[in-house]
Regions:
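Transmembrane alpha-helices and adjacent helix-loop boundaries
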Residues: 1-243
Length: 243
């Protein structure tokens, strides 16, 4: 997955720097991107971006500054109360009305922003629950060592909270990866969109229905099961409290 993302990113920089002639990778418009690779790109990028944003929102919600706390609470509660499909329609249609005339904002970038916002709100609540589960003595230990707030969070609190929240974060990541199939409703042909659209519309695939969706289900199961197994391995590696 990471190799594919790296190839896609580096290929864009290379083609933009030296042109499209005699290059192995050429720039692809977002409307032309599709298939299972689109699901992998959206899932990997959005989970990677939503984790630090979710940590910031969780800390902001517990902040003593009223403005920061209010902004984080409103953002989390609003995003959690809106279906993801609504945010995707906003990314596809509504955002264009707020951009200056003649401005082109790539569709896949708009979708990444909306999905990241959606998943970060859920990750923030998972991390907030982990922070609340920590004993009060951990905070007092940080104070007794003379650590300020950033040092206490970076060295003592967040490492323990993130270890506790691994199952919840993985649950959000798996759900987010499966929700990337919703981009088909805004005319982005991911794996499911390709099956429901051009593949089933082709006469060459007449009578073939369950096999296509069965293959798609197997692909998604392999990725989600791999994520689950990795999280269990990570939990065992980080279970230092019983050693």
């Amino acid at each position: 997955i990471f190799a594919a993302i790296l190839s896609w990113t580096v290929g864009g920089f290379v083609t933009g720097a030296i042109g499209t002639e005699n290059t192995l990778l050429s720039a692809v418009p977002s409307r032309d991107m599709g298939g299972f690779m689109l699901n992998l790109i959206l899932g990997t990028v959005c989970v990677s971006l939503s984790l630090p944003l979710g940590i910031a929102l969780a800390l902001g919600r517990q902040s003593d500054m009223p403005i920061i706390k209010w902004i984080c609470v409103v953002f989390i509660e609003f995003v959690r109360g809106v279906p993801l499909i609504t945010l995707l329609f906003v990314a596809n249609v509504v955002l264009a009305y707020f951009l200056p005339p003649g401005t082109t904002f790539d569709l896949i970038l708009r979708v990444i922003i909306m999905i990241t916002m959606f998943s970060s709100a859920y990750i923030a609540e998972v991390i907030r629950g982990a922070l609340a589960a920590l004993p009060r003595g951990q905070y007092e230990a940080a104070d007794s060592l003379g650590l300020d707030y950033p040092q206490a969070m970076r060295l003592i609190i967040l490492p323990q909270a993130l270890k506790i929240s691994i199952p919840g974060i993985v649950n959000v990541a798996v759900g987010l990866f499966k929700d990337t199939t919703l981009v088909s409703v805004i005319s982005m042909f991911d794996l499911v969109g390709m099956i429901r659209g051009p593949i089933l519309a082709s006469t060459e695939w007449n009578g073939v229905y369950w096999e296509l969706f069965g293959a798609a289900a197997i692909l998604f199961f392999v990725v989600c099961y791999g994520i689950s197994q990795y999280s269990q391995w990570l939990e065992r590696e980080l279970a230092t409290d019983h050693r």
